[in-house]
Amino acid sequence: VFGATGDLAQRKLLPALYELSVQGLLPKKGEILGTATKELGDHGFREIAREAVKEFARTGYEETGFEVFAKRLRYVSTTHDQSGTGAKLAKAMKLPHRLIYLAVPPSAFVPILEELKGAGLTKGSSIVIEKPFGHDLKSAVALNVALHKVVPEERIFRIDHYLGKETVQNLLVFRFGNTLVERIWNRDVVAQVQLTVAEDIGIESRGRLYEETGALRDIVQNHLLQLLALTCMSPPSSFDPAALRDEKVKVLNSIRPVQPRDVVRGQYTRGTVNGVTVPGYREVEGVSPNSTTETYVAMRLAVDTWDWAGVPFYIRCGKALVTRRTEIMLYCRDVPLHLFEGTGIERLTPNRVTIRIQPEEGISFSFMAKQPGATVVEQPVRMDFSYGRSFKTQPAEAYERLLHDALLGDHTLFIGQDETEAAWRVLEPVLENTPRVAFYPAGSEGPDDANSVLLSGEWHELAHHSESEEAAASKP
């Protein structure tokens, strides 16, 4: 693990590896070799891992389980320019099969791999890399060319942790494992789709890094376009990774290039989130006082496939919003004729399917029902599926699933070269456009201008209670 003392390793990777160890899912003779620029020995690294597990492990810290895990942990310090890294690691890495995790900035990917190749450590090894996969289409293509000089595509695992979430995986089962669902999952029934990735935290201390990315590159290019591809893809010929990837690429290649008029970019100013004052983005250390980097994006997309032609897809993401929520909402078309006119309701509420990805994973379906009584009075109601209530278990964290799959060599939940480049191609016209940002206070729903990308109506409110919360509140 390169970057083994960094934030990602401590919050996600080490706790996930600990959970896999406790479950007996790591190779019996496997070792975990951490490397970073900090001068640490094996003991120091194990203590960092101990604190990370205590704070972030899904099932909590357990002394005996950790001691078994800690025996696998070793550490080698490296230099900032990676010189001599290969020779150091060659002495430490004796096992023939290696999974190399690059939890480092993208600019370090190629220098590290070239150093490892020179030491003979990339032969037979697989690598895992984190987003962003390039800065634009040109740099993404260049990165892939450079990676392929060191390792072949079949041994590259590009990780998007959203794909490791249970509900994202369940989306495929929900769609293709239920005849009723698949029959309504198209332009004949669906009027519009809204995809949301909302975060209630701001940039915090990552100002300098975020100035180089922004929400388009950080969230839209990967998380949101992956969710859209899974929502729109046709049934694959099998559940084989290549078959799944082919269908997702077809969707991405069918998206019309986004035009600047279909995009609203926003940037948060000082405000209050969950009762805490949040400084404005331009107040964060490392951010230009005149920055036009977007912390919010709302966008209209068109997917020109047989199933989805004419259906508008609206995607949005943002930092420092009123709540943390990731969901996909499919709004169905109105009924062709209102048979219940004169009952006090002028328009029936369209059916809606909601896939909740976080914070509480689940799926709900809203429909019209008659209220009890002598007269016909319609009211929207919901059927709700919650992972926590239905399975009485806590889903594994995304990194647990993804690390386990990478160890097994399973590419199903990872992103391929063609997907990465297709997603960048969609955004090229917007990335080349000089941005104008609309401001919104931290703790709000985002900029008012965001509604301008909608052909009709408004965005659904982020601050609404989840369907399962409402259902629980209504119980006696």
Regions found by a protein language model. Give the residues of each.
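Secretory/organelle targeting and membrane-embedding segments
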Residues: 1-128, 133-476
